[in-house]
């Protein structure tokens, strides 16, 4: 998990490449977003606005074809994560949802919140504790070389 303290830092570090530019484009579209409605930019990025507490789960969520970028607008929450290699599969990978559910010990725990940008990489799985409401943009970006079996 990569945590950046602000959007300016994200823009400075990740300024090369179409996928990063599309992340900024998604964030710039914030005034037009309504909670829970998914939007897309091309076929490589989807995004939505979340308002409220992230669902707390006992299992860790992992992806393969997408990685997540969360940009926090308001509030703060606790996220826990661990390398997938240290976790056990509880629910096998589902190609239609790009999710797998894993169990095991928390490797790291961190409070993240307003102004921060968090990138969840594909070799890690994460879960939220649902400890407080947040307002954030959740961006799902295809992994380089990723593909869709059903398209």
Regions found by a protein language model. Give the residues of each.
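Surface/interface-facing alpha-helical segments and adjacent flexible terminal/loop regions used
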Residues: 1-35, 40-42, 116
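A short glycine-rich, His/Asp/Glu-containing loop-to-beta-strand
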Residues: 34-74, 80-81
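Short, conserved beta-strand element in jelly-roll/cupin
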Residues: 64-78, 83-86, 91-102, 140-143
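A short hydrophobic beta-strand segment most commonly corresponding to one strand
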Residues: 69, 132-149
């Amino acid at each position: 998990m990569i945590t950046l303290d602000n959007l300016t830092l994200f823009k400075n570090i990740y300024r090369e490449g179409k996928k990063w530019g599309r992340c900024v484009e998604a964030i710039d579209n914030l005034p037009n977003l309504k909670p829970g409605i998914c939007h897309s930019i091309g076929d490589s990025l989807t995004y939505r606005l979340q308002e409220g507490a992230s669902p707390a789960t006992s299992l860790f969520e992992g992806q393969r074809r997408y990685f997540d970028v969360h940009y926090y607008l308001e509030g703060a929450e606790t996220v826990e994560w661990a390398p997938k290699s240290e976790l056990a599969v509880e629910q096998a990978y589902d190609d239609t949802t790009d999710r797998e559910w894993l169990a095991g010990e928390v490797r790291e725990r961190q409070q993240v919140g307003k102004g921060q940008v968090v990138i969840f990489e594909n070799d890690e799985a994460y879960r939220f504790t649902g400890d407080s409401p947040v307002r954030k943009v959740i961006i799902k970006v295809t992994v380089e070389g990723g593909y869709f079996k059903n398209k």
